[in-house]
Amino acid sequence: MFPGSGRQTYQQQGYPPPQGAPQYNYGPPQGPPQGYYNGPPQGYNGPPQGPPPQNYNYGHYGPPQGQGQGYGQGGPAPQMYNNNRQSGAMNDVSTAPQRFGNTDMTYQLSNCSGRKKALLVGINYFGSSNELRGCVNDIKNMSNFLNRRFGYSYDDMVILTDDQNQRNKIPTKENIIRAMQWLVKDARPNDSLVFHYSGHGGITKDLDGDEDEGYDEVIYPVDFQQAGHIVDDDMHAIMVRPLPPGCKLTALFDSCHSGTALDLPFVYSTKGVVKEPNLWKDAGTDAFGAFMQYERGNIGGAISSIGGLLKKVTNSSSSNRQQVINIKASPADVISISGCKDDQTSADASINNNATGAMSWAFIKTMTDMPEQSYLSLLNNMRTLLKEKYSQKPQLSSSHPQDMNIRFIM
């Protein structure tokens, strides 16, 4: 069990990459109209019979380059936002421990010089009434991007997509959870881990009171009708809580209702300040003070207010100490970039005749066109790319107070 949930969670058992899941075979997509990564899919009664699609081999999809097929073509490029900085003027990452105000709680950033591992999940829901077209492509493009831009080895990637016929590579709930556990197993300081999900997302009633809107965000495995969805609280418990200080986890969610899908406490605006006091509910003046200090750009003052709040609840009753755990802060370096706000849908798009998730495309294109940029410029550039055609607004959240002007690395 994890704090406040009233639900069974998933213990860290040191699982290897997924093995022994039920066998599924997938027929080719039927060409559904352009839609949204909403959820859950209606009328999905299990995968159709037959071999996997023959045109979905990995070699068919080249890596997304600045001039590559499907990227950077078809009209003038939008103006990129660079935070008025040259690449050399960005702040570099400091790996020294940093304190949450005047408490004993600390966090530590990663310089990403250690091991690199990635878990990439893409689900098209072949044969369902809400079939998607771009999710499998997203994963193939992302794996190539991670390999060529950041040096991730294909041997250190677990790829779960529903166009495969190997039972341990199908994105069932069991396989996804076991792969999440594999991702964080034996994590060390300065390691860099990536989790990418493209598929249907949704919301379910919040059972532990940690969501302001009263709902938890969820993702839908390919077998969700039989096995159920995966809740943000569980993803946090599996992938965030076990991480040591100085270990980096970058999570990318290209799905609906994904703004806080990893349940991280700090949500940032395009101005580089905390946009929502998402960290505490009914926490009183300390939380409000922290939020106002961030709005004024006073990071030191904000951290001091945060420290006052944490110290107050830590020194109070055991039930309040439980609230500290539920804050969802972490000593590790965890960042989540999501395709839209919690109340928005995320587009399943066609970019130059290539099916893709709009958010996944925007992330890869932004980083390909401008490899050296800050977290702030990345968030703004993604929004600039998307705003011409899509209403969704990418979100960035973190497990700690984030300097939005440091260099984005993963």
Curated annotation (Swiss-Prot):
The residue ranges flagged as biased composition, category Low complexity, are 21-47, 55-64
Active site positions: 200, 256
Report keywords, A-Z: Apoptosis, Hydrolase, Protease, Thiol protease, Zymogen
Kindly give the InterPro entries that the UniProt entry links to this protein. Caspase-like_dom_sf, Metacaspase, Pept_C14_caspase
A single GO cellular-component term on record: cytosol
Q: What does this protein do?
A: Involved in cell death (apoptosis).
Q: What is this protein identified as? A: Metacaspase-1
Gene name as annotated: MCA1
